[in-house]
Amino acid sequence: MKISLIIKIVEGGIRPQVNQTMINIQNILKKHNATMDDVVKCTCILANGDDWGTMSEEYVKFFKSHKPARTTFGGAELGDGILVEIECIANIK
């Protein structure tokens, strides 16, 4: 499933953008009777690689004991005001 429609860019920096992105992912999973425990892999793309630590602090709040595989890289041109893109793959039964 690909979600590409941007309704509003969250202001306030990397932390609120990561938080809202992860909430959006949770909501999509919920619509398919799945949870963050069903996520097997995430790719996190940052506009600025220096945001890795802050992104990671916010990201890990959404996973309790389950830690899916993750790839993170920075220096990407994501668009005006977009600081992070997170793509997750989930095993939905």
Question: Where in this protein do the model-derived segments appear?
Answer:
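Short, polar/acidic, helix-capping and beta-turn segments at strand->helix junctions
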Residues: M1-K93
